[in-house]
């Protein structure tokens, strides 16, 4: 018998891959019944601001404001698609551990649906992939999303 995941976590970072994961999570939750829920999380990596000499709180506030607008849009989209149990949180700290361990333990998450990494090989080598870490260290099942709702490979985003 297939697992009926009831509490799905979707990390949202504004990337196309995260959007694909969100859309698939909504579809899975709707299939799994009225008690199924989607919780999105955006993690503001405060370590990224530590090396900026002119750091002030307005930078974190701007990042938080942008994340909140994106997450509000996703909540509205999910509700318009018929999923009532959808919410989000914005966390501050190290994305890897917050996504893999902290939020799943706190909320009883049974599935993390995360977008495939958007990093290139050099970036993965230097800073490591959040997706890779989550797949190795999560306290629950993890599904890495690489395709759209029709299971077609995601097109490569055009460089600006």
Indicate where each model-derived feature is located.
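Small/aliphatic-rich secondary-structure junction motif
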Residues: 2-53, 81, 160
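Short, well-ordered secondary-structure micro-motifs
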Residues: 21, 50-53, 98-101, 124-126, ...
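Gly/Ser-rich helix-loop-strand patches that form or flank binding pockets
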Residues: 4, 104-153, 159
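General small-molecule cofactor/ligand-binding pocket signal
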Residues: 39-41, 87-91, 143
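Acidic, proline/glycine-rich short linear motifs
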Residues: 42-69, 152-160
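Short beta->alpha linker loops
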Residues: 55, 90-94, 117
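Short, solvent-exposed amphipathic alpha-helices that sit
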Residues: 24, 63-74, 98
């Amino acid at each position: 018998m297939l697992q009926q995941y009831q509490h799905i976590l979707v990390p949202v970072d504004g990337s196309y891959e995260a959007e694909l994961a969100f859309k698939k999570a909504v579809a899975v939750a709707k299939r799994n019944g009225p008690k199924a829920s989607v919780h999105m999380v955006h993690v503001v990596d405060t370590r990224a601001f530590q090396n900026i000499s002119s750091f002030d709180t307005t930078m974190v506030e701007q990042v938080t404001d942008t994340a909140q607008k994106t997450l509000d849009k996703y909540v509205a989209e999910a509700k318009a698609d018929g999923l009532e149990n959808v919410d989000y949180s914005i966390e501050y700290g190290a994305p890897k551990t917050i996504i893999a361990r902290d939020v799943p333990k706190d909320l009883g998450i049974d599935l993390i649906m995360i977008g495939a990494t958007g990093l290139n090989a050099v970036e993965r080598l230097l800073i490591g992939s959040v997706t890779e870490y989550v797949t190795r260290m999560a306290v629950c099942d993890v599904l890495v999303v690489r395709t759209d709702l029709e299971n077609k490979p995601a097109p490569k985003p055009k460089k600006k």
